[in-house]
Amino acid sequence: MRDRIAEAENTLNITIEERLKDLQQAFVASDSTKWERKKEDILKSISCRLLPKKIMDTKEEKNCSDGTKGVLISGVPAKQVKVDEIQYFIDMKIEGMILGVLWIMMIGWQLDKSYTNCYGNRIRKTLYNEFSKEPTFSPALFEPYFQNYESWRDQALTLAQKCMQQDDVLIFTLDFKRYYYSVDVSEEFMKEILTRVKGKSDYNEEYLSRINDFVYCVIKRYSQIYREHSGEERIRRILPIGFLPSGVLANECLKKFDTAILDGWNPLYYGRYVDDILLVEKVEEGSRIAQKAQDGKLEFYEAFEYYTVNNSRWTGKENRNARAVFKKEEDECGTYCILPEFTKPLGSATKIQLQASKIKSVSYTHLRAHETAANL
């Protein structure tokens, strides 16, 4: 975005002020044709920027996996580096980024007010003046990430330590695999957002419709370009990384999942930081996992499935063979995915699954602590 701002400021034939005025006139034009032309011009500018996310381990790093050898990390570039995973970022005209900010100012902040137990990508509470309801024009749209991250982590650990004095405790850490690429943002999903906001917004309904439609069009256009670059065959309307509305929409996509955990399970602590989850729960005395936890023989999958897959202990659930919020995929990896009923009205191609390498369960007894960590 900084590059696009600098580019706009250094354009010789038109000033950035003139570009902003032209955008504003198109957006509020009573003639929708003018707005549609401007929108299409911005959409045509969308492209992908590719950056390495993960580098393959070097031969030396693999050799030291047994812990007997060390690795020297230096600033000297390697002769040959192999990229293991690529991260895709959206790129487009600065006007598109500005409209993304406008969506947050008009729609996103309304959605954000309804989120509970959610710590990442949170919009600043001071975005609008509490009394005048006017924008404060703060230079930052979102809360500082490090403050919310510390709060998310520390609250879980503090509660676990307090509970451990009298009860056995389980802590789960979960992470969704390539979350932004896993959702399928449907037209129905975006329309539902618009309907909810229209009922409590002072903004012109036509403007609300235009800005919401623009964000959806960006998602569709970017997803098409992403498939062309990545070779992805599955058709999904994914969340563009680097597009500001994606941060809010990422929370919106998991809102039903959050509610299901809180209402159905109601653990001692549930907190989500974008796609990372912390759960703290007291081990029920006399339960089938209590003795295993105390003996240090509790396996991850037993604890995880007891609480999140089999829903016999969930509030209002009578079918003991039914599932809670996750299902186990019939594959060799034994992947766990969120059940479709907790992702609707996202599209049918949505498949939000846990990342095996980052899933962990830790059991503590009030007499001693024992950690059980297992990859799926």
Pin down the residues of each PLM region.
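Intrinsically disordered, low-complexity acidic Ser/Thr-rich regulatory segments
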Residues: 78-84, 88-89, 160-164, 233-235, ...
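Conserved two-metal-ion catalytic palm core of "right-hand" nucleic acid polymerases
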Residues: 1-207, 232-233
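Catalytic palm subdomain of template-directed nucleic-acid polymerases
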Residues: 181-189, 193-194, 278-328
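Generic structural signal for hydrophobic residues
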Residues: 99, 253, 257, 293-294, ...
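Extracellular/surface-associated beta-sandwich interaction domains
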Residues: 298, 352, 357-359, 367
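Extended alpha-helical scaffolding regions
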Residues: 374-376
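Conserved polymerase palm-domain catalytic core
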Residues: 162-274, 278-291, 353, 361
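Conserved small/polar residues in nucleotide/adenosyl-binding loops
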Residues: 365-372
